[in-house]
Amino acid sequence: MDRLLNCPNCLKVFNNPRQLECDHILCTRCIEGVYNPGRTPIIKCPVCDKHSIVITSIDKSFPLIHCIEELLTYKYKDCNYDDSLSIPLNNSTGSSNNNNNNNNNNNNNNNNFVINNSNNKNNGATTTTTTTTTTTNSNSNSTKSKVVVNDSSPNLISASPKGLGSSQGSLTTINNQKKLTLSPQRASSTTTTSVNKPPLKLKAISSPPITPNVSTPERCFVINDKNKHVMISSETTIHNVSGLSSISTPIVSDAAIAELSKCNDHDQKKFTIFCTDCDQLLCDECLNNNQQQHENHQLNKIIQEAEKRIGDIESMIITTSLCPNRLINKKNKIEKIIQDSALVLKDTKLKITTDIDTMIENLKERKNALISQIDKEYEEQKLELKDQIETINTTIVDIQNNTSITQGIVSLYLNQVDSEMLSTSLLKKYSDLKRMDQLSDKLSNNLEQNIEWKWEPEYHFPQLFTRSNGEKTTVVYRTKRVSVGVSSSPTGTGSNGTPQQQQQQSANGNPTIITTPPLPPISANSPSPTSSSSSTLIGNIIKRSSPPHLPLSSQNYDNFGSTPPRLTTKLSSPNLSISMPTFPQSNSVQQNGSTSSIMKQQSHGSKLNDNINTNNNNSPSPTSSSTTSTNGSNTKIQLKNPVFGKLLTRKDSVITARRNWIYGFSDHQVEIYDNVTKVWRGGSKIPKKSIEYSSIYDNNCTIYRFGGKETPNDIYCYNVDRDIWEHNKVKIPSKRNAHCSVFDGLRYIYLIGGADRDSSKLLERFDIETQQWTKLASMKFGRSYFNAFYHPTKRCIYVLDGYVNKDKKSSVEMYSLEKNQWSVICEINQPRYLSGVSFDGSKYINIIGGVDRSNSRDIKTMERFDTSTHKWEILNNEPKSLLSHTSSSMNLMVVQSPQLKKNNSFSSISSHSSLNSSSSNNGISGSGGSGGDNEIPTEKMQFFNTSFFDGEQFIFFYGINIDEHGPLLYKFSIKTKKFEKIPIDNTLDLFSTLIFVSK
């Protein structure tokens, strides 16, 4: 039993024993010896090498074994205890005499259970640790036969407390004494004459290992030590005597013992033998029926096996007694988790309720603030309108008076009334009428640009959202996209207006973008345009080059009544490196096209003059921002008001400052131009040089480069935020170069055609989210070096021009995304290449210039394809003024504000006189004819590469001049009507790709 009280690691008596997760019990100091809290929370058991984890501390992680503590307490307490139980046996001679003497001298002291204290002496008597001993009393010669129980056993303990009236350490006599006799097995194993035998210690936990013929005491007393429970083997209950505790133990009945000794499988026959190999009890029937099973097995008597295994049984009892403690700990943990979860649930409910209540209060405050702001803006706008009405009334009266007076003077003058005074008055009134005309134009333009548009439903209160300092700002729509609709005009062609940008200063000096709506079409009764004419012309150019699918941004929504386009196009030839058109993405207003849109607009100017009086009934739609192009169609952009059109989320209403960059991709590296600092800086290196690839910008921050002559199956991705290139593991299924790619504004990129024979007709779709390819229907004709556009309203793709077949014919094909079907629409009147092709995003595809495929000569005409009627219209009025040809070149002329007079039309696009006259008249063009001395020559470009709009007030043109060694980049301001040259001192060349990014 002593080995159970020793630590298996230090082999000493347990000191604060604790149980590890592997069920081994160690001293606390041994556990601390193998625990290194500074390095690891894992403890390695020195007995079995299994790991245990210390969560917080050793005391909280490993339970203390209380039963061992109790055993140690009773072993080392300061009461008189004996360490062992000695059983003296009668000698073979004189045993009867000794017994008689004992009975005569100490009738009450024979065969008693006593508590041995090894540190004291009782009346001079000496107690030995041998099984057979003879104790001599100094006062009496009698021999006492005693049974002493080792206090290490927690069950069978007899007590003789000091406070019961006996002398120093005297034994307490228990009534109803019963003589103790040993079983035959133990009696035979003892020696009557020798004391050199090892002590026989009784081991018992629940019951003493004594055969039924051994008498046990009916009662035994123990000291109540700090209310610690002690198991006592007794048939009776000990009552409180002089402060002693009464302890009751369960009594196993004889019937239960008899039931356990019978076999349940064979009619309750008694077990007769134990099979050590099978580790089970057997009756005679079990042994007879299963002879083969127990053949060659070792069989043993039940009594001998029980004697052999009593130690294991005791160990198993102790081990099993620990199981409830572990289960109780687990149960307590679960109960604690339930309690903690209830607290967390309560706190979470409270937090949710508080947050939602706070949100409701904030929404109510926001609602009241918006309503107050709307009322305030309404009153301000109403006062402004009243002031304008008074100004208009005054101007009308002045005009009427001057007109009537002038008419009278003209009548006198026509009646041949010749007078110097009359002539002077006539000229004076003529000057007054011109001044009044200019004043009327200025007033009308001011009303259209700054007043009227605010009262259209789409533009009610566009500046509701303000910063904390009260400065007006814009609402950013990061991912919202709109489709561009088309509304045909029944009266033919006309002129359209364009949004104007005005930079105003807020109260604190910070600039705020205040925008204007699209101008209404010019009618016969409207005054001739003045300073706004050039803006209108540029607006037409922008609108006719608008992207096929333009997502909204902060600048798009608040700064433009119509879609601001951005052009990115490369003209190409079979022997030149090209980049096919790229389409607009979310944060960058990007679009296919070239400066041919300007020439197209100018070439159509004379026709516009002839039809300028046919659109007097066209006006902006009250429910949308509308612009009227030169062909007489109204382009409607459905824009929702930020308050009434949709419920803004936190993401939608984020206020951000936007910056613009130009990304150029040369053969060597990425060149980045900051539009604020006006400085070029080098980016990352190009991973692999290639030509004839197509590039496109997605809705996030990635520019895809598909194919190319050197990399026909590769996809390279450039991250504009991280300035890194990545080689996409996904390959293009077919070889692609000299092809086109279009983006639907959502998630799909379409690759069309190419120079390779196997892929010249193929159409494949790339999903930028799943990175998977899908093969779609093929075109009717193979194409390369062509142009393609996506029509968002019809959900179709138009492809036209390029190298189609040997007979030098060119056609227009349309692909329906819903039907997955190609159809040939018509043929192009004049097949060409190296031409400027643009799509206005709604109705017309325009082709200008280029080289005739039949004779390789320059083409001087411009054609326009109507996507609604599928018909071509040739616009060839004054082609010489439209295209100034030197070699195979197209000259870019400054677009100024021409006067609507018979001797000056929109077709005269050379920069005659208007710049000087406009600057001398505060932006109002003079009336000079062809320009004369006021003519200002401009730079000339050939092979226009890229044109795009920055979304505010600048149009960028990228190309080459035959007299220059490097490419040219110009920035044209639609506000000041001036060109500004951006120096290029980097690796860009003519065929580099330029992409505009706004964030």
Curated annotation (Swiss-Prot):
Signal peptide: none
UniProt feature, compositional bias: Low complexity: 92-143, 485-516, 526-536, 613-635, 904-924
Record carries keyword ATP-binding: no
Biased composition, class Polar residues, residue ranges: 165-196, 552-612
Domain of life of the source: Eukaryota
Classification via InterPro entries: Kelch-typ_b-propeller (IPR015915), Kelch_1 (IPR006652), Kelch_domain_containing_8 (IPR051746), Znf_B-box (IPR000315), Znf_C3HC4_RING-type (IPR018957), Znf_RING (IPR001841), Znf_RING/FYVE/PHD (IPR013083), Znf_RING_CS (IPR017907)
Keywords tagged on the record: Coiled coil, Kelch repeat, Metal-binding, Repeat, Zinc, Zinc-finger
GO molecular function, one term: zinc ion binding
Location of region: Disordered: 92-147, 159-209, 485-637, 904-936
Kelch repeats: 655-700, 702-745, 748-793, 796-842, 844-892
Coiled-coil zones: 355-402
Positions of Zn(2+) binding: 263, 266, 286, 294
Zinc-finger ranges (B box-type): 258-302
Transmembrane stretches, start-end: none
RING-type Zn finger ranges: 7-49
PANTHER family on file: RING-TYPE DOMAIN-CONTAINING PROTEIN
Name of the protein: RING finger domain and kelch repeat-containing protein DDB_G0271372
Species name: Dictyostelium discoideum
